[in-house]
């Protein structure tokens, strides 16, 4: 299993609806509107890193109002 945080910037006025749509995607465990450099932070899970990448590119980035994403994959440290 792989997991990642997706940091998302939206067009002005689009964060609320985008967050709602992101939250409906299978594998998205949480999606929150936040203050700071990003508008939304989502936590996603999938079978592997490739699946996470496909989810970001084909499902999250295709939502109307999504301007930019940055994905940080969760790693297990000893």
Q: Which residue stretches match the model-derived regions?
A:
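A compositional/biophysical signature of low hydrophobicity enriched in polar/charged and small residues
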Residues: 1-78
């Amino acid at each position: 299993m792989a997991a990642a945080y997706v940091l998302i910037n939206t067009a002005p006025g689009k964060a609320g609806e985008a967050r709602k749509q992101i939250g409906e995607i299978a594998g998205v465990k949480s999606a929150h509107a936040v203050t700071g450099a990003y508008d939304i932070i989502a936590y996603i899970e999938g079978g592997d890193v490739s699946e996470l990448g496909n989810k970001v590119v084909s499902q999250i980035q295709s939502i109307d109002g999504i301007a930019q994403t940055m994905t940080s994959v969760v790693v297990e440290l000893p």
